[in-house]
Amino acid sequence: MEQKVKEGYRVFTVGEMGISNTTSSACMIGAFNHWNAIEVTGRGTNISDERLKHKIEVVQKALDINQADPDDGLDVLAKLGGFEFGCMTGVILGAAANRCLTIIDGFNSTASAFVAKKISNVSIQYLMASHLSMEQAHRRSLEKLGLSEYIDLDIRLGEAVGASIQKKILDMALTVYRESMTKEQVQADGSN
């Protein structure tokens, strides 16, 4: 992280690749917020009703068996998360330590944002949500973090797709801000 900051990077995006990661995310977000499996579990990659029922059972069983401490981000991560969630959490914390922005992607990176917030509450000040995922608990999760999505494209992907789109929107907004003439400059130039 420090090397990238030295190279001039100030904005980072996080996302993940995998199958069934929304199951872990549901467990983690459920643990942090004292939500049961029905409240927090969604369809992921658009699974059937039968698979959703099974997924809800798995999430509730994981919550019941592991009894992760909702006040301890590392405990929740260790008991209910996985390597990819640890990596995203590390990026969020590293960026915040360097006063850099991290744009989180969907439901899965939101779970990592909860871990980061429990480890260092200040990390939330350096987070931007990108999009609203299709997971039923995503909006409510963002609200718990004090974040709002900027785009809603019905995305079911977590590979930093939404975060990359949001980064481009941010880049365009900054370009317009930096390169547009002010009203005073336009009047002085005589242009309309």
Indicate residue ranges for each PLM-predicted region.
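N-terminal loops that bind phosphate or other acidic moieties
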Residues: M1-N192
